[in-house]
Each structure stands twice: as structure tokens, then as C-alpha cells.
């Protein structure tokens, strides 16, 4: 079974191709989600028989999450592919994620807060896991916006 994991809340964008839950190919792409995702997915949809797409729906760049959701939801509906979502904290060792200005999303025992970082805080890069078997993907795929509208 082919599954694709899409992380658009970081730069570069990370896209992993998984066969039987194991990573077989990864893409690290610089650029805007709206430019990069359609070009890559045109190739992926022609090359693989994709059964499921998983994308990061929280927290991070609202625009990147929104664009990814609309694009992936449309692709999944038209190609009859299952869409799931997952938190970005799963792929950066639960490290703070850039929010707005100098503030970051911080996950404290499943309680999300937005705050400034402490001086000794370490930020981890996002990484595609070698295996996606242990992750608990969510069938509720709407983007989760953690900041109020400005």
C-alpha cells in the first residue's frame, strides 16, 4: 500500500512516499506550497497507486496549511484517496514551531500555547519518519487554526 506524508509547515517542504508503512522515497522542496505541491503531485499521481495521503494540519503557517488542505482534499476526492491529518509536533521531536513574529507554538502535555521561547530552548528541524506504523493519524482533516484572526 502506498501512502504519502506531506509536511508543508516547514521550509523546505517534506514529502515522503511510504510503501507498507516504510519510507521508500523523500522529497525536500524549496518554494511556496501553492507552486511546489501541484507540480510534484502530478508526477506522484501518475507514478503511484496512492491509497492514503497524510498531511500536517496544525500548528504552523496558516497559508501553507490551508493551501495544502484545499489541494490535497481536492486530489483525494477526485482520485478516491483517503485523507488523514496529524500534528506537526509528531515530526520535530515536540519542539516549538514558529507562530507569529517572535512567538512559537509550544506543546505542553497536549496543551498548546503561543509564547516567546526561553533562551536555552532548542528548535528541532522536521524529519520524515522511516516508518509511519506507530503514528495515530486523524480522520478529521480540517486545518486547525491556533491563533485568532488578525
Where are these regions (language model features)?
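Oxyanion-binding and handling regions
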Residues: 1-39, 46-47, 83-150
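Short, contiguous strand/loop micro-motifs
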Residues: 28, 58-59
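Short secondary-structure capping micro-motifs at structural edges
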Residues: 40-41, 62
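DPxDG-like acidic metal-binding loop motif
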Residues: 52-57, 63-83
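Short, structured coil/loop segments at alpha-helix boundaries
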Residues: 60-61, 118
Amino acid at each position: 500500500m502506498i501512502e504519502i506524508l506531506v509536511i508543508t509547515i516547514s521550509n523546505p517542504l517534506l514529502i515522503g512516499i511510504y510503501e507498507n508503512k516504510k519510507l521508500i522515497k523523500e522529497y525536500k522542496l524549496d518554494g511556496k506550497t501553492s507552486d511546489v505541491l501541484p507540480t510534484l503531485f502530478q508526477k506522484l499521481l501518475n507514478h503511484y497507486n496512492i491509497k492514503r495521503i497524510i498531511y500536517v494540519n496544525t500548528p504552523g503557517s496558516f497559508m501553507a496549511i490551508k493551501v495544502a488542505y484545499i489541494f490535497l482534499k481536492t486530489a483525494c476526492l477526485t482520485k478516491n484517496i483517503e485523507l488523514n491529518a496529524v500534528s506537526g509536533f509528531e515530526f520535530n521531536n515536540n519542539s516549538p514551531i514558529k507562530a507569529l513574529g517572535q512567538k512559537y507554538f509550544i506543546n505542553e502535555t497536549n496543551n498548546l500555547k503561543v509564547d516567546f521561547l526561553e533562551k536555552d530552548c532548542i528548535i528541532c528541524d522536521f524529519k520524515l519518519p522511516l516508518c509511519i506504523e506507530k503514528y495515530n493519524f486523524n480522520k478529521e482533516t480540517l486545518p486547525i487554526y491556533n491563533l485568532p484572526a488578525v
